[in-house]
C-alpha cells in the first residue's frame, strides 16, 4: 500500500482512500487529479482486491483515457484496466455485449463525420439535392439538433421500425430537412451504423426496456469514477444515475472554474448540486497546484475571483517562484505578433525548444498576423486544427480496408473498391447500387454474385473480391498491425502511393501502423479487429500530436486539459476575448472561466498581449476586461502603461455591461415548442441562444434553421 500512497498530499490521499459512497472532489487546475484518479483505481485493485472489470472510469477525451490506462498499467502491472472510457466509448462496450436487445449485430459500425458525409452523398444523389439546398456541415448539425431536441424519440424508430418502413418514410419526405433526416436514419439502419448521439440513446433504451441487462451492468460496476464532471450533459448524467443505482459508489472530479462547454450542453449545476441530490456526500478540496509558478497562479486567481457565481477558492502554489506574468500593449496586430515572435526567439536563443512555446487565442482569425510573423522569421509552427490525423485520406482508406475485412459494409466498399484504381468507376458503381437495391444485398455481395457479368469485364473486380475473401477468412487471431501491413501491400495501395511520390502519406500510414501496434500492446487479448475499429471511430481532435520542433498554435478550447512550458495568450481585446457575441452575464462569466483555463495552461512563463486598432464594425479596439481584472502589481508591463487607455477601456467595459442580460429565461420559449412566424410559417424551437438573444427555429418549409430575435413576434401553436 505504501507505494500507492507515497508522494500524495493530504487531499489526494483522502481522495484515493475514500472508496465507499458518494464522493465529490473539487480539483483545481494542475492539482494532480489524474494522479489521484489513477492511484485510486490501483488502490481499489491492489489493496481492496476489486476486479478491474468491476470499475468504470469515465474521461472526456480518448487521449485522457489512453493516458489513464498507461498510468494504471504502470501502477498495477495488469493489462486488464477495466472500463476506462469516454461515455461514448463505454456505450460501445454496452452495445457490443447487448446489441441483441435492439436487434443490431455485435459488428455494428460507429459512424464518424466522413461516414455521415458518405451517407449524405447517397441521399443527395437519390433525391436530387445539392449543396445549395444544404451543405453537408449544415446537414450534420440539423440531424444532431433534430435528434437531441425536435425528435428526441427518433431512436425508437431505428430500433422498432422495419427497414422498409423507414425507407417509405424517407421516400414520402418532401422538404430538404425531412429528406435528409429520414434518409439518414434509413442509411444508418441499413448498414447497422450508430453515430455519437445514438450510442448513449441506445444504451439508455436497453437499460430502460431490459431490467435484466440493466441490473447486470449495475451489479458489475461496483465502483464508478467520472473525471471533468463540470462538463457533463443531461444524457450523460442520466446514464450515470442509472449505472450507480445499485452499489451507490460514485466518485466525481471537477472544477466549476473550468466550465467552458455550456454551449455544448454541459451544466455545472450537476457538480455544484451533487451534495443536494445524493446522500451523505463527502466533498474533498484539491487545490495544491503542481503545474504553474506562484506568479502565474496569482494572476489566474486574481482573474477568476471577479466571477460572482462560483465556489470561492484559490489555487495554492507548490513550485518555486519564477518570473512575473508579462503584459504587452501593442499599437497594431502586426506589432503584437512581432513582439511575440521576438520573445520566442529570445527564449529559443536561451536553448529552449520551440515545442515548449504555445500560442493560445479565442478565435482562429486572430492568428493571421502571428502566422505571417512566424513565417517571416522562418520559425516552424503547427496549427492544431484543419485535417486531423484520422480524417486524412490515406488513413480513412487504410481503416476502410480493415472495416471491409471485418464487416464488408457499403460505406467501406464505396471508399476502397476503386482505391487503388480497379476500373470500378461511377457507371459500374451505379450498376451495383441499382442491382443491390433490387436484390436486397450489400454492394460487396452484389459484386460477388455478378462477377461474370459483362459490365465487369476489363476490371480488377475479381482480384478485389479474392483479396477481401482471403483476408476476411484469415484475419481473426492475427495482430491487427500485421493484417494492415499485409493488405496494404497485397492490394497495391502502398505501391500506388509510392508511384505518386506521396511520401507524407506513406509516413502517415507508418504512423498508423505504429499506433495500432501500441494499441495492441496496451490492450492485450482485448485487441480484436472489431474492438480496435470501434475504438478508433471515437477519436477526435488532438488525439494525435504533430511531431517536430515547432511552435504550437491552438484555440483555448483545444488547449483544455493540456499544459505547456510557455504560453502566449494573444488577442486580449474586448470583443475578441471576451467574444463580441456575449449577451448575458452568465455568458461573460463563462468567457472569464475560459480565460482562466488559458492562464492555467502555463507552467513556467505566461505572456499576455493585446493590440489597439479598430474592430470589424469600425469602433475602437480596447484592452480586454480580463487584463483589467488582474491586479496590476502581479503583471510585468513591457513599457509604461498608458493610463488614459486603461480609463477608456474601463469606460468601454462599463458601457458594454449595461447591455448584458441576466440569464433568467424571460421571453424565451421552451425547446420543442411549435410556433408560427408571419413570413416563414410554422416551425419548431430547437434551441435558445441567449448570447445572441435569439430562438433557433427549424421552419417546416426551410432546409436549415433560422435564428429569430427574442423580440420577434411568434405565435405559439399548441401547448
Language-model segments: what does each one mean?
Residues 31, 230-309, 313-318, 437, ...:
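Conserved helicase motor core of SF1/SF2 NTP-dependent helicases
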Residues 35-50:
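Walker A/P-loop NTP-binding motif
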Residues 170, 353, 367, 371-379, ...:
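Conserved helicase C-terminal RecA-like lobe
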Residues 571-704, 710-719:
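C-terminal accessory regions
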